[in-house]
Structures are given as structure tokens and as C-alpha cells.
Amino acid sequence: DHGGARIILVDPEFAGVIAEALTLMEGPKPFVIDVDDAAFSGGKRIGAIEYEAAVAAGDPAFAERPPADEWNAIALSYTSGTTGNPKGVVTHHRGAYLNAVSNILAGNLGQHPVYLWTLPMFHCNGWCFPWTLAALAGTNVCLRRVEAAAMTQAMDRHGVTHLCGAP
């Protein structure tokens, strides 16, 4: 409730939990978009629209609007509480940009990296790798679970060039 989310993308595996959480909200409910995933069977749709349909319905003439202030929030992530109580972490545009540039330079990623997501995106906003990969026109390879067999299969199948890890 306190984050003020206006849109939420829902993985079908967690649709039940999200549906319950939405009933507990006191403020305005976010617009819910379902994300289909061929790697998961089950779950139910709780959203107003499916992700690919939402993208297809977009306005191709939409004019980009840069943030009014580089210190405005670009992302709000919630930790799982590994080292203490769960907490919300705000990333601002300036910080995401500077961190992404630092990742590019220090990581020597090159153009079009193929990145395997083993680092949770909620973990410091995935160390800002979502923005890093966007800047480099990289490929995101996602797993349903971080398991050794799935990781090696993804590496072979997609030609993974980079990944990060956290305990």
C-alpha cells in the first residue's frame, strides 16, 4: 500500500498471493497485468490484460518524457529480509544511470551481452543490471528457479556471456 504502485505485473505462479494482497489494500488498487509463461502451468489470471496484449495496444507515437528531476524514483524494490527485516529500497534515475554506466565500464560487458539472471532483481535492483542491459541492447535470460541444471542448460541454449551472483 505505502509504495503507491500504479501498475503490477503478475507471474502466474504468484497470482493467488497477489490477489490476496490486493484485497488487503486500503488505497487505490494498481492496474494488474498478467504475464504468461510457457515454463509454468497453473495459476490463474487476475489482471485486466495480458502483458503482450498491453504492449501491442501501446501508442507508437507516444512521446518520450524524461524525468523532471534526475533524483525522482525510477524503481521501488522490496528485499526479502535476508540480513534483517524486509525493507523497501528506492532507486532514483541518477543512481540507476550512474550504476549502469559503472557496470558497463567495470564489467567490460561489450555490446549485446547475454545475461543470465541468477541475481534477484529485488537485490539492490539487480545491482542495476536491468538498466545496464537495456543500455547495451542485451538479452535477458530468466529462470523460474536458480538451480544448477537449469543454469547450465540456459548457458548452453542461449550462449550466456555474463551473470552475477549473491549469497
What are these regions (language model features)?
Residues 6, 12, 49-53, 71, ...:
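Structural detector for helix-capping/boundary residues
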Residues 97-114, 122-162:
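Conserved AMP-binding/adenylation subdomain of ANL enzymes
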Residues 1-56:
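Structural core segment of the AMP-binding/adenylate-forming
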Residues 34, 48, 56-78, 85, ...:
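Conserved pre-ATP/AMP-binding loop-to-beta segment of ANL
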Residues 1, 65, 149-152:
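Short hydrophobic/charged patches on amphipathic alpha-helices used for structural packing
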Residues 74-99:
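Conserved AMP-binding A3 loop
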Residues 8-20, 37-38, 119, 144-149, ...:
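Adenylate-forming
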Residues 8, 73, 79-82, 115, ...:
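Conserved S/T- and glycine-rich ATP-binding loop of Class I adenylate-forming
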